[in-house]
Amino acid sequence: MRKYVLFFISGNNDSQIWATTPNTPRVIARGGLERNIHTRTLARMVNEDAPGTSTPAAQSRLQTTASPFHRTHLTQMCRRGDTNASLLRDFTRMIRDTPRNFSKNTQHGNDRDFGDLERDPDVDLLLSKVCLECVYVEPKEGAIPKANKIFISNFLSDMYINLVSVTGEVMKIIPIWKNAETTRKNLLEKGKHEPCVVDCVDAAFVMKSGITVVLGSDFTTAMFGGNERIAPIFIKEMSNQRVGRKFRLFSFAENRIFAVNEMRCIVVEIPETVTCKSATELMRTCFLHLDRDLSRKLLIKWRSVKRDVDTERLDLDRKEMIDVAIFMLDNVGVRVTNVVAQERADSPEGHGGKQMRPRMSDSEVLSMMRQFFEEMTFRPKSEVITEDGYKCHLSVELDPNGEGFVHTQDLLHAFHSQCEDWSINTMMHSILLELIPYAYLLAKVMNYRAFEEYYVQLFKHLLSQIAIEFKIPPEIHEKFVGAIHIPKPCWSLNNVIAHIICERTTPETMESIPKFISKSSVRLLTILAVGRKFIGMGTNIDMDCERWLGKDWKRRIGLSGDILKSFRRIMNGKSSNSAGRASQLIELFEIGSITIDFMVLAVKVLMLKFQTDAFAGAQSIEPKKCIYATADEMISIAHLRWKNDIRMHNVQLMLNSSRPILIATNILRKNEDDNMKELQDRFLTQTSYRTFSQPFGRAFLDFRTAVPSLLTSIYIPRLNVGGMIYPSRVTCDPPTTEIFKLCTEWGNFYNSLASALRIGSSETVRIDNEWIVMVSKNIKSTAVIGGMTLGFGLNGHLAPFNMYHAHQMLSTFDKFHSVALLIGLSASNFTTCDVQIHKILATYLSFLMGPTPLEIKLDFTIQTAAISGLGLLFADSGNMTIAKKLVNEIGRAPNRDEEPVTDRNAYKLSAGFSLGLIMLGKGNGSASTVIPFKQNIPPMSQRLIYMMNGMRRDKCVFLPQVAPPVVNDVPNLPFSNGGMMTSSQVANHVKESEYINIHQSAEPAAIALGMMFMKMNNEFIANALALPGTITELERLKPDSMYSRVLAQCLVMWDSIEPTHDFVKSLIPPVIREYATAALHFGVPIRRDEDGEEVHEAINDAEEKYWAEIVDKGTVSQTFLYAVSAACMAIALKFSSCGGPNEKNIVNTAFRIIEYYTKIVMPDGKSNKDMGSIRMCIYSGAYTRTSCLSMLITAMAILRVGTGDLEVMRYARLLRLCDKPESDWIATGKKHFEQMVAHQALGILMLGEGRYAFKKDDLSIALTIISTFPTIPQSVSDNSHYHQPLRFLWSMAVEPRLLVPFDIAESCVVEVDVTIVMKPKDGNEPIVYKEKAPYLLPPLEDLQSISIGGGNYQLVHISLQSEDQVKVMKDIMTIGQGRVMLKRYGVDSSEMKIKEATTLYDDTPSLMSMFNNEDTAVELDEYEIQCMMEKIDEGINLNSSDEYPNVQIELSCVRDVTERTTMDLAQLQKRSLKLLSESLDLWQDEVNVSNTINGLADAVQDMQI
């Protein structure tokens, strides 16, 4: 016991005053009980002599009186501790802080447990009675005088209320533990446990030691354990009667108390029960197994004889643990004596003179030196071997009185339980060897053969070095054996673990574990059972635990309160698998990495595997804050994905429109007479086709790669259409013609649109209306504002747009503003059917607006944008009212109000797109459930077929009547004139007959029909869409419409799409295939000459003339190419961005098929083509060949989206550079389309800088078809046949899929393995394959799980089996930018660990030296050892634990651990290796290592010890 004395001087002797001055605490409004206690206490116990209470009336109310005296902080603390107000502190905290339904045997931070006292419904009244009757009210019979202090103490889990009365010099100790009813009896009915009254001046409770220090009335200090006296404490400063009366005791820290008077403060340190960890664990285990009353007596007895120990002693841990073991044995009647070695031999006499001590012998000097060097090198100390060869001698006797014999069995189970706990903790193996002899001799004395044989089997070498002498008379031994219980089976923690990890064990065959296993081991077994899916897989967790652990499973695991709630939450969590639950239990049970590191290898490997495999589905990975990748990060990602080239940089240069156009004058001017200015203007006009089309591709490349600054405007790169003359480097202004200015306006529109698409979507970036208005305010060009607005709308940022600003922009009737808002607002409200947006669109559509007195002339481009927005707003809604009106718009004839009708084709095509979006995959919709009118109206599908093939207009167009119905005509008809117009409504410029104009209605009708029946496999619709089977019928069709019909047929018969030549040919009419072979010689094998060169047949004029009279070769060629391009587009749409080994093979096959047909339409001289391909290109015409080539290259790009495929990139560059700009680009009329498709293909390959891919749902497929529809515009401003702003609808059909592993510590992108598990299809097994990340994932809906990491990084597992998990993964891809945060393992290789360990020695120990040592010697020759270790190395090198780096390190250390195992632990190590081998059998990939380690265990077993 230590004490520290502090002195302080006061100017006044005011101890009596400040000791009784009340200091009212803050009243916490918890309830009536607490307020009642505080109020009544302060009202009754206030001191009449204290300041502030001069009048009696003041005694009945709460008062706070400040002390007039100045004290130090220590004095104030002591003062507060002795005031009347703080007398209630401990007790009121118990009332306030104790939760309801408090479970029994629960230890909290303050080591106070109220059991089920709080469960009693009358607990408040009971506690109130305790307070008021025992503390606060007037004395009565059996009560003590007025109490000055109250505190709670506990001793061996029993709780007591201590009431100290300074005036009466007594302390009353009331037991309150057991349960509520017992407590009530003790307090009210004078039950068995009577309160104890002790003479006491003051007392304080020491929390850590669990004792109460009492200052008696005779001024002696004593220790109490609960209500029993343990031993006295001598404190010199308090032994004087005159001085001791003035001391007051206060708790301080965990094992210290304050003794304070007016002049000094003494800090007394109470010694701990035991000092070392091993002794503490052994004593706790013994007390848990022994009877409660016996444990109480033993603890009091131990504390009474406990003395200070020498903490500097090196073998303190070992000695104190042995003392505890001998003490426990002695108190159950088994007396064990450690026979001390004989006295040291006399040393020879010295060389005369006086000697202070005898001279040491040579053997003693050698022993002392060896001990010194072993301590310096941190080696374990060698045991002292006596002359007879034994390490120690133990003498065993039995108490002849037989006291404690009945508790012997409990003590044996306590020793055995502690030995088993230490056997799985390698750090405690040395202490385990000290306890084993005492457990063995106890089992031998008790004649428990099973336990005796168990210890001999495991520790035969150790027990052979210990001499045990039994000095037990037979009659006493018979009395002893008769007193003990029948022996119970010997159990082993190793066997329990082996049973759990055995492959053949199932939840049904799992055996219940012995009840003697400690709480820490039960927790470990629970983690292993949860990891093995034995617990937690059913719906009733309590039943599983009760079946395995018994009815008291909560107590055995140590669950109560918040820990029990957390345990249930973990086990009932649906987002985690077994490994995830096991990892969470490791954290809940506070099993740290250091504890795991000292477990035996088998358990350690399983725990590390659980931690590595742990995940909570998508719950284990939460999307981080959206921080878009910086330029350096994107460069690093591109470098990791494409290590050997700079393809990303090349694509960026090809899509850069801000550089001036280089004009080489030496090439342009071919003779001196040419006008250089005219040549420059013409050259700039032609090259502007490329510049104006670059934003179409740059929108793909930069898609959602930036976050705007809210303080600055959006960055829009300059659209540079000027030139720079070479070599003079003089700038050249662009042409000033009206056509060029119009193209420049539309070019700026698409340029700003592409810049706006750089901003992230509304899911990741929030942009408000004010910022959009601020950005637009400083821009003068309406085209730039319109393109920017449309880009914001496509990204979803116009959903919260202020309608006031929208109407303000629309009221200008500017076409750029109108087009942008009508499409942008609809895109931001995609599929929502918003009423407000519907009203805006209806304003621009006469068939929705109806007759109006306003005569407003609207641009047809604006009306086209409105009808396109209508499809986006009502997409996938099946609105039959709007759908029927759109059908009429496709088929009706132009009227006088719509002249001139320059954009009529685009309007009808957009109406077809909108109709397809609204009725997507719904067929005829709800038409079958509608009551028919008296007039027979065909189904919607039939009307579209009429419009596609041709029919009278009154059979498919049913316009609502405008004028009042004619009398005596067909009454009450909703339609009049059969869709025909009156003479006043017929247009002047265009006269259409009574039949449908299929040249304008065929394409929209076909594409709408295909979308309506998408993936429905309706053979009737598919046959209607199929190309006719005769040349005559084919010649009636517009060639462009063939592409729409074939593609629509593929959409309907989606399941029949296959990447084969047979599928492509099945879509071509047989007559076309026959004529292509006969008339064009297409597909005829090329003959080769003797040298192997191709021999192309010359065109025979007679044959050509013959076939020209028989068939139109142009029809054959165009039909063939359009059918092929549509079939290839369908293949690309279905198999785009698919993953998995099988899918990759399918994608590669599909690519080769598309490439095969692409080479047919390649420009002349760019590929080796046969004569049939050349003839087909000649007869099909330039436009057909351009359209088909563009679609085939687009199909290849869609198939390889986001991959940066070099082959597709070469085809796109070929299309981009097939004609030189100095040729006549203007006259061809198709260069803008070619350049646009080339740039689109380049952008698709690098979509979002490689982060995005196309989605696979029906809406996304439809939007992709609309944005890539092969209608050839003449220029960037040409919207007559196709509304070009629809080219950007693909932005709503893509999703991020790039998985980016991100090193948290280094804040950089790293390359790791990613294992992908595909969902099983058609009843097959799941497909597993491995790739390198960063990696573009397949569609998330097709994945079952993803595992990313391994090697030096943690392995993160993401499950995608439920919709919630897929949603979280999509959030990771969008909000988190695809980043998966990985932690790098700070582990070294096994060689590094061994190297660091051997640096402690002067000489690196060799294998043979370790085995030749007396502690590790085995009788194996060097060759056998070498073969065994080489086999281990070979097996470890063959394992596949790269995904578990910590496990890999532990397996690599098996050899090192085995070499350094002492002979005393050889069998224990052999058992551990066997367990490790069984644990590795759980991994299919670790068979080699398991067999190798199993062989090592057999070799260790065969060692002759």
Swiss-Prot record:
Q: Name one GO molecular function term.
A: molecular adaptor activity
Outline the subunit composition. The APC/C complex is probably composed of at least 12 subunits: apc-2, apc-10, apc-11, cdc-26, emb-1, emb-27, emb-30, mat-1, mat-2, mat-3, such-1 and gfi-3.
Pathway(s) of this molecule? Protein modification; protein ubiquitination
Q: Any idea which UniProt keywords this protein has?
A: Cell cycle, Cell division, Developmental protein, Meiosis, Mitosis, Neurotransmitter transport, Transport, Ubl conjugation pathway
**Result of mutating residue 1196 to K?**
In ax76; maternal-effect lethal
Q: What happens when the gene is disrupted?
A: RNAi-mediated knockdown results in defective metaphase to anaphase transition (Mat phenotype) and embryos that arrest at the one-cell stage.
Q: Mutating residue 333 to R has which effect?
A: In ax102; results in sterility
Instruction: List GO BP terms, alphabetically.
Output: anaphase-promoting complex-dependent catabolic process; asymmetric cell division; establishment of meiotic spindle localization; metaphase/anaphase transition of meiotic cell cycle; metaphase/anaphase transition of mitotic cell cycle; neurotransmitter transport; polarity specification of anterior/posterior axis; protein K11-linked ubiquitination
Under which name does UniProt file this protein? Anaphase-promoting complex subunit 1
In the record, the note on similarity to other proteins reads: Belongs to the APC1 family.
Q: What is the effect of changing residue 1297 to K?
A: In ax78; maternal-effect lethal
The UniProt function text for this chain reads: Probable component of the anaphase promoting complex/cyclosome (APC/C), a cell cycle-regulated E3 ubiquitin ligase that controls progression through mitosis and the G1 phase of the cell cycle. The APC/C complex acts by mediating ubiquitination and subsequent degradation of target proteins. Developmental role in early embryogenesis and the metaphase to anaphase transition in oocyte and spermatocyte meiosis and mitosis in germ cells. Required for embryonic anterior-posterior axis formation.
Q: Which organism does this sequence originate in?
A: Caenorhabditis elegans
Record GO cellular component, one term:
anaphase-promoting complex
